[in-house]
């Protein structure tokens, strides 16, 4: 399981710890990932995703998983999230017709 958010693509970053004497040692900045269950209102199903805390706040801000995925850019989403987005868009089109 990779250390990457499935919704925003946020991954591990690298940088330096810098001491008072300006000594630099390499370190990793890990994303704050949480295993959460999000419910799709359109598909009426729940999905377990590994998302960052900031992505979880964004999902709630946009009004749920469905509206977040519809507005999200495909290149940021994981393969699983892209599949979920396609299913949601297809189901919404069926309901509108």
Swiss-Prot record:
Keywords: Ribonucleoprotein, Ribosomal protein. Pfam families: Ribosomal_L28 (PF00830). The keyword S-adenosyl-L-methionine does not apply. GO terms for cellular component: cytosolic large ribosomal subunit. The keyword Ribonucleoprotein applies. InterPro entries: Ribosomal_bL28, Ribosomal_bL28/bL31-like_sf, Ribosomal_bL28_bact-type, Ribosomal_bL28_sf. It comes from the Bacteria. GO terms for molecular function: structural constituent of ribosome. SUPFAM superfamilies: L28p-like. GO terms for biological process: translation. Belongs to the bacterial ribosomal protein bL28 family. This is Large ribosomal subunit protein bL28. It comes from Bartonella quintana (strain Toulouse) (Rochalimaea quintana). The gene is rpmB.
